């Protein structure tokens, strides 16, 4: 009697082509939620939707009632933005986005990991969660405040995401670059090397350098 609610907002930004929704294994019991803000690079432009099977029609009707009594409709500017986003085939856009994010994410991973920083290789999206191995700070929030003060790099503490505050985890976004300019200069499937990243995402490289120096100094 279990119903699965699967948040797949980042599914289009998976770096490998083997992503498979859980709905393909249990379609009659799965509700998929997704939207355009992540794949479209439109943070703050919130337009999402549910994919609900006919077998869960009763839940669909309840969601419709709840939505209509809560927010009625998406704001007009976001609706027009969504028309633009979905009116044409966006596969080339997605492929370029994934290519860029994979290259930049791997650069951050390869250059930040050390015996002072634990970090997993990126599998999709545009975030990493490094753990800084030090006992200088009482909380991840205190650590992030010090990183911002010492390096100018802004990170969110792991405690903001439910991790214990005494674990020195921080969420890092590697998107401080002009995505449209980057995309305009590459081809689908192009190999993105260091020189290309340095040309279009110099702030990311600078930020990683500052974080690495900081981690080695504490």
Feature annotation, model-predicted:
Residues 36-37, 116-117, 158-162:
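Short, solvent-exposed loop/turn elements at beta->coil junctions and helix N-caps
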